[in-house]
């Protein structure tokens, strides 16, 4: 009998003023505080993209941060979430900034 909570994975892309405002560093800190794993990186088109994995309620907390909070100097216009699915195990051991 397993009491493990289901794990979720979701991809995201954040639009707005999200580069040059320490967004990735704050995202990494927030993910570690919440307890999710995955990654974040800048794109060549001025957005921030990545993936979040963890228990559903923690992933939902990170989704809220990515769409409403961000770093202090950022301005989030919108956040697109895609490929949301249930996973059997985490694919990452931590949350990291990619370059």
Curated annotation (Swiss-Prot):
Enzyme Commission code: 3.6.1.7
Catalytic reaction(s) noted: an acyl phosphate + H2O = a carboxylate + phosphate + H(+)
Keyword Phosphoprotein tagged: yes
Sites bearing N-acetylserine, chain numbering: 2
Acylphosphatase-like domain mapped to chain residues: 9-99
Cross-referenced Pfam families: Acylphosphatase
Residues with S-glutathionyl cysteine modification: 22
Enzyme class, broadest EC rank: hydrolase
Catalytic residues (UniProt): 24, 42
Known role: Its physiological role is not yet clear.
Protein name per the record: Acylphosphatase-2
Phylogenetic classification of the source organism: Eukaryota, Metazoa, Chordata, Craniata, Vertebrata
């Amino acid at each position: 009998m397993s009491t493990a909570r289901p794990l979720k994975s979701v991809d995201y892309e954040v639009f707005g003023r999200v580069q040059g405002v320490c967004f990735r560093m704050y995202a990494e800190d927030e993910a570690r505080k919440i307890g999710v794993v995955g990654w974040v990186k800048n794109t060549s088109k001025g957005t921030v993209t990545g993936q979040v994995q963890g228990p559903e309620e923690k992933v939902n907390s990170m989704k809220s941060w990515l769409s409403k909070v961000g770093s202090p100097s950022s301005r989030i216009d919108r956040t697109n979430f895609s490929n949301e699915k249930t996973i059997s195990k985490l694919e990452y051991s931590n949350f990291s900034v990619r370059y």
